[in-house]
Amino acid sequence: MPRKFDVLEHELVPKHVLLSKEEANRLLKAMGLKKSELPWIYSTDPVARALKAKPGDVIMIIRQSPTAGESVAFRLVMRG
């Protein structure tokens, strides 16, 4: 039986975290943003599918960099 590929475990895919509604609301309030002002990620994106993200959810992306250290970004899940 073939092994299933887990996109979240690939070395080139940064850590993605699906935020709860409460976490997303706290984040948006702290940053003074509306959900509509966040960059998008489509619900059909392989990582969004692996996280079972639904349109309207917010995903936190944590990237490691040898020069910048750690970079955190947020994406709004859109139907797509």
Swiss-Prot record:
Location relative to the cell: Cytoplasm
Keywords, ordered alphabetically: Cytoplasm, DNA-directed RNA polymerase, Nucleotidyltransferase, Transcription, Transferase
GO cellular component labels: cytoplasm; DNA-directed RNA polymerase complex
GO molecular function terms noted in the UniProt entry: DNA binding; DNA-directed RNA polymerase activity
InterPro entries attached to this UniProt entry: Arch_Rpo5/euc_Rpb5 (IPR014381), RNA_pol_subH/Rpb5_C (IPR000783), RNA_pol_subH/Rpb5_CS (IPR020608), RPB5-like_sf (IPR035913)
NCBIfam families tied to this protein: PRK09570.1
Subunit record text: Part of the RNA polymerase complex.
Protein's job: DNA-dependent RNA polymerase (RNAP) catalyzes the transcription of DNA into RNA using the four ribonucleoside triphosphates as substrates.
Protein name as it appears in the record: DNA-directed RNA polymerase subunit Rpo5
Record gene name: rpo5
